[in-house]
Regions:
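Glycine-rich beta-strand-turn "strand-cap" elements at beta-sheet edges
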Residues: 2, 42-50, 77-99
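N-terminal first-folded block
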Residues: 4-34, 42
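Short, well-ordered beta-strand segments in beta-rich or mixed alpha/beta enzyme
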Residues: 4-11, 40-68
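Short flexible/disordered coil segments
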Residues: 8-9, 71, 96-99
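Short acidic, gly/pro-rich beta-turn/loop elements at beta-sheet edges
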Residues: 18-20, 51-53, 99
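An amphipathic, aromatic/His-enriched active-site/gating alpha helix that lines ligand/cofactor pockets
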Residues: 26-38, 57-91
Length: 99
């Protein structure tokens, strides 16, 4: 195994999309800068703005669990809880490094 991948799809309530976008970009930057076990944290948005998709790569599942325990993640999660209409989380074992 060459990593642990997490994908998250958020459907955000329209009135909170701009604030959510700002909050997730801040969380992503903090994850890359402050978590040695996080090697990628891509934030993507559907063209119509209706969904935000995250693609995160961690060294292993333990590094992802450490991410969930960080202060910046806990703040983000509490902040956006009422802004999110739907959240889907999937995890994968990465079979090959893409770059």
């Amino acid at each position: 195994m060459t990593g642990f991948v997490v994908t998250v799809a958020f459907r955000v309530k329209p009135e909170h999309r701009a604030a959510f976008r700002e909050a997730i970009l801040e969380n992503a930057a903090a994850s890359i800068a402050g978590e040695p076990g996080c090697s990628a944290f891509d934030v993507c948005e559907k063209a119509d703005g209706s969904e935000i998709f995250l693609y995160e790569i961690y060294d292993d599942e333990a590094a992802f669990k450490a991410h969930l325990a960080t202060g910046h993640f806990k703040r983000f999660d509490a902040l956006v809880a009422s802004w999110v209409a739907e959240k889907r989380v999937l995890t994968y074992n990465r079979l090959n490094p893409g770059n």
